Amino acid sequence: MEGYKIFIGNKDNFENNYGFQFEEGKIYETDQEIFPKKTGFHFAKRLEDTLRYGNAREEDVIICKVTALGKIIEYEDEYYGYYDLYVTDKIKIDKILTREDIISYALALPEYRLERFIQTMKLSDEEVKLFMGKSSLIDKYILFYHYNDKNVFNTQYKGR
C-alpha cells in the first residue's frame, strides 16, 4: 500500500518524532507489535493528512512517498476528521517529495482537502499567490492562517 509520511528535518537529515533517522530508498522494519498512535511506522493515504503528525507551520519538514510492505492496521481520528490513517511494521521510503511536488499536489486538491492543507502547511508568499482566488473560502483560510487576519471569519449581522 502506498501513502505519505512526514518527517522533521531536511532532505539530508530527517527523522520521525522519536528521533529515529530515515533515508530515501531504504526499508525499515520493527519487531514490536504495532498499535495505532503508539508503535510502528505511521503514514496516511493523503499527503495533507500527514501534516497532522508534524508541525509544518513551525518546523522544517520533509514529506515522503512511502510503501507499506508488512502488516497494516487502518485507523481514524473521527473527532478531528482524519481518516485513512495507517500503521505498519515494515515501510519503504520511496521518494522525498520536492516542494514543487507538494505544491503541485495541493493545487489539484478539491476544496475540502485544500482547506486542511492551507491550515497546516506554511507557505511562502509566492506559493500563497498560487492558491489565492481558487475559492472565497480558500482565500479566507489563507488570510486567517498565513496573514493572521483574525477577523476574516467574523460574520457581521445587520440589525432589524
Language model segments and positions:
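Short, glycine-biased loop/turn motifs at secondary-structure junctions and
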Residues: 1-160
